Structures are given as structure tokens and as C-alpha cells.
């Protein structure tokens, strides 16, 4: 008879990220009836609950919580890993990949002016910013960084804010004034990457107040794909999906492995790549291009599975082949068919990195007529066949780091 485990999950559940993470945990344990889950608040990490549970998945928000959990000697998966403790297993999103994805997205849209908007002294914001800046500087660009005002005793982040568990820093009026000044002074058009969707909604709201067009003057990209912020902004916000569902699933898998092992549990670490960018109107802009160009690009992205050709794009936008090709060469430096091929490869790479989908299904999903044709084209573009890329790139969903 299998041993029964009582598992405590202490994760905030007010945000979409937290709820998706919890869903991932629940999905993993759904077919494991010997594992009973209890959803707790961080404040409920007490001597009694520590005794009652065999393992923990939590966001460790302070040293007191860390000490209490460590003293039990029980398996713990820290689901934030900003200042990791060597004795615990950890699960974290790939902050560097998020910043890199944002930079590459804006570069693909041919922006030359860039900005970053985050928080003061908040680790996840700093890590995303650093990767964003590094990629742009490698391409010869110098992004403008918004630096929130220093307000003694008022906008220093609390432990919860440091972990991204509350909505923004203190001193909101002063912050809004400084952010408005920063937005006004940015060279236009500009692409602004925000460390999360709450910050992106701040920028969108202030752009409206300043009569700055989004995305024509200011393109905005957030992180977390939180429907409350993304769908209630006008226009709706594009956002990077960190794949909280996969993070929760991986955290549960880590804990279950340790609970099920008869050997002393060795701390493990996993880093999960972002799922990708959820495109909405706030980044639907290509500086210097005619109005129909963004529609053409969206059409290519949305119809890639159908195996579309350049002729389909010409028909969709309603302009001549000569005109459309001339604009594509001017804006992107490539033909329409070359852009279609690049979008296909980019989509395939994303699926190979972030899913366990069979390669034949990836070929179909990205519009290739056969797995052989897909493999040949992918190898020509990337230098490796799809299977080798999956092994040498970021493994799907669960990169282990011992």
C-alpha cells in the first residue's frame, strides 16, 4: 500500500500567475490519490501546520519562514528562488529568457528606440531588465531605463513587493508624475518593455492621459499575461506568458520525487522558459510602415498553420505584389516569402523549446507539408535538425539543474 502524503501549498492566489501555478500543482497530483493537498497562506506556516504536512511548495517571503521550514528537515520546493537557499529545491521562471524574448520581439518590429519600466530594487524586475538591455546593447542600441523616485520610508519595497506579490511600489502619485515625465521625453516611436502587466497597465494609462498613441507612439509589452490587466487596458496589452502552469507542474513533480524516494532527498533546481508572447494591440506597430503592414504581419503569424504563401498575403491586404514586396524589403529587409519562412522556423523553435509535442505535430502546426520537408528546412535555417535542437536548446518544460 502506498504511503499517504500531506502536502502544503503556500502560494498567493490573488494574481493570474499564482492561480495558474496552483492549477499546475493540482494537475500533477490529480492522478495521485495518496497525496492530499492543503492550500495555505504564508502566515499559516506555523508549528502546527509544519507538523501536519510531509512536504511544502511555497514562496518563501522572509527569513522566519525559511528558518521554520528548514528546521523541519522535510522536503521543500521554493517557488520563487530569488535568493535561493541551498537546502531547498527550487523552481523559477527564466528571467533572462523573458528579457531576451522582449528585446527580440521589438527588434523584429524594427524599432530603434527602446525603454524599460520596472520597480526600484525588486529582483525579478532587475533580472528582466538586465537581459533586455544586454540584447539591445549587443545590437548597438542604448535603451532608456525608467528609474522610480527614491522616497525615503515610502517607496522602499516590502518583502511581499520584493517577491512581486503586491501591486506596485509605494508613493504612487510621485511615481506617476516621474513616469509621465519619462514617457514624454522618450524619442518616438518607442518600444517599452515593462517588468510585469501591472506596470504595463500603468504605462498604458499614462500614455492615454498624455495623449500618446499606443502602439504608434509607444508600443507596450508586459509579462504574466494577466487577463485583468491585459484585457482591461485600452488598447489591450501584449504580454509574455511565463508558463505558470508548467512552473506549478514542475514544482509538484520535484516535491513528489523527493517524497517518494527512500533515499535522503537531494535539493534539485529547475528553470522553466517562458511560453511565448501573447500578441495584442499594444505592440501591433512597425515604425515607418504603412497602416496595412501590421495587419499583414498579424495575418502571417495567425495563419502560419495553414501553409500560407506570399500570394495569400497579397490577397489579404488587397495590394499588388510589387507594392507589398517593396514595403517588406524596406521595413524588414526581406521578401514576403522569406518572412513567412522565418515565422515558421521561429514558431517551430518555440514549440521545440517549450513543449514535448512530437516533431511530426510541430511540422503540421507550423505549416509544413511533411516531417521530412520540415526537417530539411529547419536544419538549413538553424544548423541542426529539430530533434538535435530540442536536445541542445532549452529542454521542453523542465530543465533540471543539480
Regions found by a protein language model. Give the residues of each.
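A secondary-structure capping/hinge motif
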Residues: 328-336, 376-389
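Short, positively charged patches
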Residues: 60
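Bacterial carbohydrate/catabolite-sensing allosteric modules
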Residues: 1-55, 63-316, 325, 330, ...
Amino acid at each position: 500500500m502506498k504511503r499517504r502524503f500531506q502536502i502544503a501549498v503556500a502560494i498567493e492566489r490573488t494574481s493570474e500567475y499564482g492561480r495558474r501555478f496552483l492549477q499546475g500543482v493540482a494537475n500533477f497530483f490529480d492522478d495521485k490519490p495518496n497525496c492530499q493537498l492543503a492550500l495555505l497562506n504564508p502566515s499559516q506556516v506555523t508549528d502546527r501546520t509544519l507538523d501536519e504536512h510531509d512536504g511544502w511548495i511555497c514562496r518563501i517571503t522572509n527569513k522566519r519562514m525559511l528558518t521554520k521550514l528548514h528546521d523541519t528537515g522535510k522536503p521543500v520546493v521554493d517557488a520563487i528562488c530569488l535568493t535561493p537557499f541551498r537546502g531547498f529545491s527550487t523552481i523559477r521562471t527564466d528571467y533572462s529568457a523573458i528579457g531576451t524574448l522582449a528585446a527580440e520581439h521589438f527588434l523584429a518590429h524594427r524599432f530603434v528606440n527602446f525603454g524599460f519600466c520596472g520597480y526600484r530594487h525588486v529582483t525579478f524586475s532587475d533580472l528582466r531588465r538586465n537581459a533586455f538591455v544586454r540584447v539591445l546593447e549587443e545590437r548597438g542600441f542604448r535603451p532608456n531605463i525608467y528609474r522610480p523616485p527614491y522616497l525615503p520610508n515610502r517607496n522602499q519595497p516590502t518583502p511581499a513587493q520584493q517577491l512581486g506579490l503586491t501591486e506596485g511600489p509605494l508613493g504612487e502619485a510621485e511615481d506617476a508624475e516621474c513616469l509621465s515625465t519619462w514617457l514624454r521625453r522618450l524619442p518616438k516611436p518607442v518600444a517599452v518593455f515593462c517588468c510585469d502587466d501591472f506596470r504595463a497597465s500603468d504605462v498604458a494609462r499614462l500614455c492615454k492621459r498624455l495623449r500618446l498613441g499606443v502602439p504608434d507612439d509607444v508600443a507596450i509589452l508586459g509579462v504574466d499575461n494577466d487577463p485583468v490587466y491585459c484585457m482591461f487596458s485600452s488598447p489591450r496589452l501584449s504580454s509574455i506568458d511565463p508558463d505558470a502552469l508548467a512552473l506549478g507542474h514542475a514544482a509538484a513533480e520535484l516535491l513528489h520525487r523527493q517524497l517518494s524516494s527512500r533515499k535522503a532527498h537531494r535539493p534539485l533546481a529547475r528553470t522553466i522558459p517562458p511560453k511565448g508572447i501573447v500578441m495584442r494591440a499594444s505592440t501591433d506597430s512597425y515604425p515607418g510602415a504603412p497602416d496595412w503592414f501590421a495587419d499583414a504581419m498579424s495575418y502571417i503569424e495567425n495563419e502560419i498553420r495553414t501553409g500560407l504563401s506570399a500570394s495569400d498575403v497579397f490577397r489579404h491586404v488587397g495590394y499588388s505584389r510589387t507594392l507589398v514586396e517593396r514595403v517588406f524589403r524596406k521595413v524588414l529587409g526581406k521578401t514576403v516569402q522569406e518572412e513567412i519562412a522565418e515565422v515558421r522556423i521561429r514558431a517551430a523553435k518555440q514549440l521545440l523549446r517549450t513543449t514535448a509535442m512530437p516533431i511530426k505535430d510541430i511540422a503540421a502546426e507550423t505549416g509544413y507539408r511533411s516531417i521530412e520537408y520540415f526537417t530539411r528546412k529547419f536544419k538549413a535555417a538553424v544548423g541542426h535538425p529539430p530533434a538535435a535542437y530540442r536536445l541542445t536548446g532549452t529542454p521542453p518544460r523542465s530543465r533540471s539543474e543539480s
